[in-house]
Amino acid sequence: ADPGQQNKPDAWKNLSFDELKEAVHKYTYDVLYRLKIMDCAPDMVQIGNEIRSGMLFPDGAVPQYRQLAALVNEGIRAVRELLPETKVMIHLDQGGRYNCIMPWFDSMFNAGMLPIDAIGLSFYSFWHGTFMDLKDTMSRLIKLYNLPVYIVETAHPWRHCKGDHISKELMETAGLDAGSAEQKKSLEIIMQIAAEVSKDTGKTGVYYWEPVGVPGKGMGTWFENMGMFDEHGRALPGWDAIRDFDPKNPPIKELDKYIESLYEYEETPEVEDFMKLLMIHGNLISNPEFKDGFNNWQIETSLEEGQYTLGKDGVFISSDANFDYSISQTVDIEYTGEYIAAVDYRGTNTTGVEVELFMDVEDESGVHTYTSDIFPDDIRFVTHLLKPVRLQKNARVTVGLRMHTPPVFAKIKKISLVVI
């Protein structure tokens, strides 16, 4: 399960809500009982996995917080009944984004969620904000809820992926590039952050997902570069970071200053060239920066109107539930030539986020679609380009942005179409 995948098991698909609650309680109790009789009772139990969008859809999908709280409570009760000494954790993604985490916990406690013993966060630097965002989020959560906070999922690629799961473009938002030394440094930073912010509670931890993932046939793209062993099964330097870490003698001096130095950006030559073309030839999109509202734009979405609004930075989209969103404009091409589409986009990222810039072309030869995946960056607006497309005179072209995503926020500043 992750924020985009929280469906019920097939065996539970037709249960009533009361039956579903009973099934959660029984399943949790039975699994823990088997562990207990084998003398393997856990010290801590996490109810659900990355449940910021909910769990057991559709019954427990956010924003149905009361129903979600009722389901979570059945898991908590099962733990308390069988293993009263075992701690209970709730685990969310977006570890570097306090404004995603705090409202969720407030909503759940207000909806009747039972007391818990710890907060667990996922933090992947290429999805979940900067390292400083992580430090700020952990500090504020500890202070607000008086609970220890753990990093229960993290990883960093030890090489660039042969597939496209963790691309070079995505790693541009991570502060550190892919590499075995960078994996070690990422772990040092995260462990030092956790230790520093948890001095008063004295309780924290960092868990790597998944250290024993070794590249191999049928293992999937995550294991191409996210484990802590290389393709020959040799341990990577990241293990040294774990073995040698001492909170009393941390590896990084002046941590905040070091983190700040990691995030320096320059526009790519391709974007610089595009900006020059935009100034020379102009934008074929009407109302490209939404100064005239949504005039000339077509929108298709599962969101309510209040969840996508206009502000000084263009379109702002925010949802606490999974959603689809598409915004586009159709242009008739007057001259044959090569054209580039672009979008200035800023937004949060996590597991299951799908955002793409697209161009649908209708001409004498038929209908053609061109797309470019966007890897969101919530630190700044990034200009994303579609590779040049040759368009014929009288072609009808639709340019826009599509989103299919778990709960995130997004900003669309400008959409462009320029002839080369």
Kindly label every feature range from the protein language model.
Residues 255-420:
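Extracellular and organelle-lumenal recognition/adhesion modules and their flexible linkers in secreted
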